[in-house]
């Protein structure tokens, strides 16, 4: 009986020290959030537009980290899809869009604008400039075409317009493989 108390007395301090060490390590080396979701979120464009089907970029990043598709972000486009594929070691996929829509930007009819600033507050990328009770305008190069400024406008003076074709978003048609092969044969 005396040996049992001796064994308990010897093991109890060792167990308490080990438990305290594990408790300290759990607090000291705790990982905040999901590191993969944080890395994915850093690659997304942070427009918070909801075009991916999620209420913002962070929920979409968490969904990607949980296994959702990486090709649902129209503002990020192909460059974001390639970066996400490299990060997650996946194959890049084409952008998942219901139909290919031309790029659009918001346009404010300044004569109708009352300067309420609701569109400025709604814009996730600060592409709208103006001041209270003064007309507002859109910086077209900054606008992602997310449509978030349309809803809060009380006088409906904002519309989405297609951007004119220029070198920034011009798409050349892909050559057909047959044409390329025939050109090689003629050159040889």
From Swiss-Prot:
One of its GO terms (molecular function) is 4 iron, 4 sulfur cluster binding. It comes from Pseudomonas aeruginosa (strain UCBPP-PA14). Residues 1-26 are annotated as: Hydrophobic. Its EC number is 7.-.-.-. Residues 104-133, 134-163 form the 4Fe-4S ferredoxin-type domain. It is found in: Cell inner membrane. GO terms for biological process: electron transport chain. Residues 32-90 form the 4Fe-4S domain. It comes from the Bacteria. Keywords: 4Fe-4S, Cell inner membrane, Cell membrane, Electron transport, Iron, Iron-sulfur, Membrane, Metal-binding, Repeat, Translocase, Transport. Belongs to the 4Fe4S bacterial-type ferredoxin family. RnfB subfamily. Binds 3 [4Fe-4S] clusters. The keyword Kinase does not apply. SUPFAM superfamilies: 4Fe-4S ferredoxins (SSF54862). Part of a membrane-bound complex that couples electron transfer with translocation of ions across the membrane. Its cofactor is [4Fe-4S] cluster. The gene is rnfB. Pfam families: Fer4_21 (PF14697), FeS (PF04060). [4Fe-4S] cluster 1 binds at residues 49, 52, 57, 73. [4Fe-4S] cluster 3 binds at residues 123, 143, 146, 149. One of its GO terms (cellular component) is plasma membrane. This is Ion-translocating oxidoreductase complex subunit B.
């Amino acid at each position: 009986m005396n040996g049992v108390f001796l064994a308990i007395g010897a093991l109890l301090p060792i167990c308490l020290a080990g438990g305290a060490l594990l408790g300290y390590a759990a607090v000291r080396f705790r990982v905040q959030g999901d590191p993969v979701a944080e890395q994915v979120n850093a690659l997304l464009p942070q427009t918070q537009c909801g075009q991916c089907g999620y209420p913002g970029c962070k929920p979409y990043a968490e969904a990607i980290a949980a296994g959702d598709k990486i090709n649902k972000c129209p503002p990020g486009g192909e460059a974001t899809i390639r970066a996400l594929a490299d990060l997650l070691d996946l194959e890049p996929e084409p952008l998942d869009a219901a139909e290919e829509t031309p790029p659009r930007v918001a346009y404010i009819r300044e004569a109708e604008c009352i300067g309420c600033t609701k569109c400025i507050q709604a814009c996730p990328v600060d592409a709208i400039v103006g001041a209270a009770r003064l007309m507002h305008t859109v910086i077209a190069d900054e606008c992602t075409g997310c449509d978030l400024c349309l809803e809060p406008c009380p006088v409906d003076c904002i519309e989405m317009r297609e951007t004119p074709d220029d070198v920034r978003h011009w798409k050349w048609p892909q050559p057909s493989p047959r044409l390329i092969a025939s050109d090689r044969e003629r050159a040889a």
